[in-house]
Amino acid sequence: MLDFSLFVWYHRLCNYTKYLFRIIRFWTIKRKELSFMEALKYPPILEEFLNYFSTVKARSPNTIKAYAYDLILFFRFLKKRRGKVSDDIPFDEIDISDVDIDLIESVDLNDLYAYLSFVTNERSNTPPARARKVASLRSFYNYLYRKAKVISKNPTQELESPKLSVRHPIYLTLEESKKLLNSIDGPFKERDYAIITLFLNCGLRVSELVNINLDDIKEDKLTVIGKGNKQRTIYLNEACIKAISDYLKVRPKEGVKDKKALFLSKRLKRISVKTVQYLVKKHLKHANLEGKKYSAHKLRHTAATLMYRYGNVDIRTLQKLLGHSNVSTTQIYTHVDDSQLREAVNKNPLSQE
C-alpha cells in the first residue's frame, strides 16, 4: 500500500519544480531583454528624452527602463509599418538608431491605435500594459512638443487610454491586523514586530523600510526616500515609537557590517527586501492569515485602508503620507466594504418602519 505521506511529498516536489522552472524561464527572458536593450544603440532623441526624465524629472531607474522598452517597441513597429525594413529581419532585431524627427513627427492618431492593436494581438498585452505604453508615448511626445520643441504637433493629445477595471486593494481587517501583531514570535521578535508595526501604521513601501537609517529618525519624525528619490516625512505614533525603542534595546552593536542601517539581518547586514518579504509571509502563516494572498505590500494597503476608514483621514493627506505623486493612485483606498454598505442601509431613516 502506498504511503500517503510519500504521495504528499512527491506532489509538493512536483509543484516546487514547476514553480522553479517558471522562475528560471522568467529571468532568462528578462535577462535577454535587458542585455539586448543595453547593447542597443538608441537614436539621439530617445537618449535625450531618457536623460531628461532621469535627471530633471528624477524618475526611478525602473521607470526609465519601462519608457525605453515601450518606445523601442514603438519605433520598431513604426519602421515596419512604414516599410523601412525588409520582411526577413526579425522584429526584435530591427535597428532603431536611424529613427529621426521626421519619422517621429509623421506619426498620426491612426498609427498610435495601430500600435496598440499590435501589442494587443501580437504581444498579448493586457489593458494595464497597454495603458503604460500610452503613458510612455504621451510623456515622449509631450517632451518633444513642449520642452524640446522639435515637433509642430502632438498626436497623443487625442489618444485615449484603455479602460481599466477598478481593483479594490487586498488588505487585512483591523482584527486581522491585531492578530498578526499578537502572533509575532521567534529569535527576531522585536525586529519583526517593529517592521510589521511600521508597515501597518505608516504605510511604507518595502524598499523604503529596508533603506531606513538610524539617523533618519528624530523623535517622532521618520524621513524616507520614496519613488523617484522623493523625500517625505512620516510622523510616528506611540505604537511605532515603542516598537522601535524595544527593538533598539536588542539591536546588535558588535560586528555590525552596516552601522547606519536601522534593521539588520541575522548576518548583521542591512536587511534585504527579500528577507522582509519572507518574514512577513512567515508571520502571516503563523497567524493563520496566509490564505488570502497577503504580502508585505498588502500591509501598506492595510495601513492606508485603516487610516481612511477609522482615522477620518482625507484623500489629500493620505496621498502625501503614502508618497503618491498623483491623487488618482490614492483613490483606490476610498473603497467601501460590505459592513460599510450594511451600515449605510441601516442608517436610512425608514429602516425601522
UniProtKB/Swiss-Prot annotation:
Chain's role: Site-specific tyrosine recombinase, which acts by catalyzing the cutting and rejoining of the recombining DNA molecules.
Protein name as annotated: Tyrosine recombinase XerC
Record lineage: Bacteria, Bacillati, Bacillota, Clostridia, Thermoanaerobacterales
Keywords for this protein: Cell cycle, Cell division, Chromosome partition, Cytoplasm, DNA integration, DNA recombination, DNA-binding
Tyr recombinase domain residues: 167-346
PROSITE patterns: CB, TYR_RECOMBINASE
Active site annotation, chain numbering: R205, K227, H297, R300, H324, Y333
Cystine connections: none
Source organism: Caldanaerobacter subterraneus subsp. tengcongensis (strain DSM 15242 / JCM 11007 / NBRC 100824 / MB4) (Thermoanaerobacter tengcongensis)
Keyword Cytoplasm appears in the UniProt entry: yes
Domain of life: Bacteria
Database matches in Gene3D superfamilies: 1.10.150.130, Intergrase catalytic core (1.10.443.10)
Annotated PANTHER family: PHAGE INTEGRASE-RELATED, TYROSINE RECOMBINASE XERC
Record has Repeat as a keyword: no
InterPro entries: CB (IPR044068), DNA_brk_join_enz (IPR011010), Integrase-like_cat_sf (IPR013762), Integrase_catalytic (IPR002104), Integrase_recombinase_N (IPR010998), Integrase_SAM-like_N (IPR004107), Tyrosine_recombinase_XerCD (IPR050090)
Location of the Core-binding (CB) domain: 40-145
